[in-house]
C-alpha cells in the first residue's frame, strides 16, 4: 500500500490535471454586420490574437435605433478601435450619422451570450477536492 503522503500527492496532481484547461488559442464569437447576435459562431483565434471584440454601429437618428453588430478576434482593442474609427468612418461619426461602440475582453467566448454553468472538468475537480480529505482518511 502507498503511504498517506503519496496518496495526498497523487490526489493533488489529479486535481491539478482535472482543473487545468488545455493549452489552446482564444475562442471568440465571430460575425460581421449582423443585426442579431445569435447569428454569430464560435471561432478559434489566431495565436497572436489576445482579445475578443464586439463593435456596435448604430444610427442614432433612426427611430428604430437600427444597429449592426460585429464580433471578432483581434490582436488588441486598440487595433479594433483604429480600424473602426478610420478616417472614412470618422466623417460619419463626427456628423452624427453613425455611433460606434467597441468593447473588448480576454476570455474564451466572452464577447457572446453569457454561458450558464461551469465546465464539467471544473465540477469534477471541485468534487474531487471536496472529497479528498475523506478519501485520505478512509485509508486502505
From Swiss-Prot:
Membrane topology per record: Lipid-anchor; GPI-anchor
User: What's the domain of life for this entry?
Assistant: Eukaryota
Please give the Gene Ontology molecular function terms for this protein: acetylcholine receptor binding; acetylcholine receptor inhibitor activity
Q: Which Gene3D superfamilies match?
A: CD59
Q: What are its GO biological-process terms?
A: acetylcholine receptor signaling pathway
The UniProt entry lists the main location of this chain as membrane
Indicate which residues are glycosylated according to the record. Answer: 36
> InterPro entries this protein is in?
LY6_UPA_recep-like, LY6H/LY6L_nAChR_modulators, Snake_toxin-like_sf
The yes or no answer to whether the keyword Signal is present is: yes
Domain UPAR/Ly6 residues, every copy: 26-91
Question: Membrane-spanning residues where?
Answer: none
CDD domains in the cross-refs: TFP_LU_ECD_Ly6H
The signal sequence is 1-25
Q: Which Pfam families match?
A: UPAR_LY6
Q: What is this protein called?
A: Lymphocyte antigen 6H
Q: What is the lineage of its organism?
A: Eukaryota, Metazoa, Chordata, Craniata, Vertebrata
- Identify the gene encoding this protein: LY6H
